[in-house]
């Protein structure tokens, strides 16, 4: 094919792909299957590889990702991205309306109108378009500046790479100059569930918002694309023909190719606002995405500037947040799950009950001390709560409704999977199955941990496949994974030659992971990712680590006598030694390589601990940012700790830091230090 014909076909393919993108993401009226869409995209990518000079920044092929971003540069926002003041009280919403009406009256205005919109539970971002082309995308950050994550945002199909302008009467002027669009990146419920199913149980995200925040900060844009996120726009500024009202600007955004909140409604007073909040209190659970409240804004945009803002939030808007959802049900029984370390976790079996838009039949009871604290018995009426978490929890017993016949929840004497007698080490809350080598549940858990994202990140090795491998005797530990053949894998349920080869390719790729990741992947009790990094730095080979005594190990930063004893105990086990031999023969990294260059030295000499819930970062990734800037992460507060980063609902660690006089900062200050 010559260049002219390729250019013609590329143009047709781009137009067709963007048309189907719009039908799928904006209008929910798909005309072709995912398979047919992928064929169009693959054809475009093939032609652009053959004629790279024809690639443009707004081509649909640029959504696929593939680049690695070593660090995210800082972008200063043109206007501050303020957070909204929020409330859980309808009365406080009414107070807000009264204040606004008084301020508007003082400005000589009439009765104001409001726009009520659903509050998407996602991550706020800013998009900058120059002459209609996306040139920059950034996070909210501290409100004044954020991280530039354009490469990751390009992978989101509902973010236009080039703005459309089909409705000239609505706009009245060309899309020239710089236009800023703000909105929320979020993850649909089905995409979130699919992502969590791929991860081991202990590494699953608590909710779609956490998954979104973590995904946006990934350095691999191809992985961002694979996770499937969405975007809803709610702010437009910089366009010469922008409408005078917020509702009309939402229409303009839709005409430009953005998805906007479908439920946005003009409200003329508090009665209509209260009706909207009440209506969506239940209806929101039927939506394919998470919403956690209602945003209320003045419709007349000219009033926004006149009313202004406080240091933290605008005076012309407020967010009403729905309270945590609770429901009453009956605890019908308890089952016991076995974790990778043999931990026995009680799980409540409930009378199926609707909660937060879904039918709940199970909830966690955490451990036997929690059962004792609650005083819960089988047959009790209990209150369950879901507040952002995927798994609901039992929060109380309705003692007034306790039936005459209830049964105590007894600690099992044997492992529910392998039948081994359970043990409870002195000073421990949990009971354990001591059959490490033989218990199928522990084998499955260890292998899933080994393959998890923060360990060796072995794609395509999910729970269903690992269960088959263990149950059929093909794999007993992580070392056996590297002896698997395509024939063995292809013979398993829901596997074929292609999917089997994908697993083998992922296993081969895992051999290139770091020595520190391997130490974490081994699943040594008390050794998390941070401790594994300290070990890798202090003991640069597995052989040297195995030879160290407890005293030498305890001298390693962040280790101490308990972890040191756990490490020695782990390496003394014959099955562990056999597994390490298999891993070494397979070519896994048994010693440290060259250390990665630091981003900067902003945290050099700092011993840092995070406590409480961060709003804009996933804990593990925030910790990695500290390490990349020369700092150390510690697991507990002591006199040696130099910095505590406190998020929402920070608890005992914050209290201890204050008592010891350790410096405490919030998330905004942390971001400024980066």
Curated annotation (Swiss-Prot):
Binding-site residues, Zn(2+): 415, 418, 433, 439
InterPro entries per the UniProt record, alphabetical: BRCT_dom (IPR001357), BRCT_dom_sf (IPR036420), DisA/LigA_HHH (IPR041663), DNA_ligase (IPR001679), DNAligase_adenylation (IPR013839), DNAligase_N (IPR013840), Hlx-hairpin-Hlx_DNA-bd_motif (IPR003583), NA-bd_OB-fold (IPR012340)
Pfam families cross-referenced by the UniProt entry: BRCT (PF00533), DNA_ligase_aden (PF01653), DNA_ligase_OB (PF03120), DNA_ligase_ZBD (PF03119), HHH_2 (PF12826)
GO biological process, one term: DNA repair
EC number(s) per entry: 6.5.1.2
Active-site residues annotated for this sequence: 119 (n6-amp-lysine intermediate)
Binding residues for NAD(+): 34-38, 83-84, 117, 140, 184, 297, 321
First-level EC class: ligase
Its job: DNA ligase that catalyzes the formation of phosphodiester linkages between 5'-phosphoryl and 3'-hydroxyl groups in double-stranded DNA using NAD as a coenzyme and as the energy source for the reaction. It is essential for DNA replication and repair of damaged DNA.
Name of this chain's protein: DNA ligase
Organism: Chlorobaculum tepidum (strain ATCC 49652 / DSM 12025 / NBRC 103806 / TLS)
Taxonomic lineage of the native organism: Bacteria, Pseudomonadati, Chlorobiota, Chlorobiia, Chlorobiales
Gene: ligA
